[in-house]
């Protein structure tokens, strides 16, 4: 598609634990994707809400960490690793033009994230080790995942296929 059209202005991807499939891109796929992105110089939004919640297997590099041309805009959120429903996230880019446009759009949408949510998050980050917290919630989530998989295996007909979330 990239070779045959000039209409592609941006690509949005979730390479880690894509919802609803739970699929994760392999390292090889990430590398090939970045080769294409660099060749055609297409901006990419990498949405990574679940990246910190890997239960098994090895962590894979983000596309942003593989980005040599500043084409990847990385999005993260506190709602999956700190508090569900919390509407605080972050944007990582060194492209000032992109960040300026994002700021403009954000202000047009809601001016700012809740001040109370920001203060709660700030206090939590000052008082706690975020990595240790993530490990605690992963222990809870992996038990829930295992219970869900067990129930699905016991209940669903064999024709039903599903992924084993990592």
Question: For the regions a protein language model found, what residue spans apply to each?
Answer:
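Residue-level signal for well-ordered alpha-helical positions
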Residues: 23-24, 56, 66, 102-105
């Amino acid at each position: 598609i990239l070779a045959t059209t000039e209409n592609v202005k941006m690509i949005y991807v979730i390479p880690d634990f894509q919802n609803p499939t739970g699929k994760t891109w392999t390292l090889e796929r990430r590398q090939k994707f970045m080769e294409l992105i660099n060749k055609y110089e297409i901006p990419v939004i990498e949405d990574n809400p679940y990246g910190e919640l890997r239960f098994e297997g090895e962590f894979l590099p983000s596309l942003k960490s593989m980005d040599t041309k500043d084409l990847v805009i990385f999005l993260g959120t506190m709602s999956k690793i700190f508090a569900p429903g919390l509407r605080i996230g972050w944007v990582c880019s060194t492209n000032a033009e992109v960040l300026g446009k994002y700021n403009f759009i954000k202000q047009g949408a809601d001016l700012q994230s809740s001040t109370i949510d920001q203060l709660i998050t700030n206090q939590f980050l000052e008082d706690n080790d975020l990595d240790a917290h993530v490990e605690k919630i992963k222990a809870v989530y992996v038990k829930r995942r295992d219970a869900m998989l067990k129930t699905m295996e016991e209940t669903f007909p064999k024709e039903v296929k599903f992924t084993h979330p990592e």
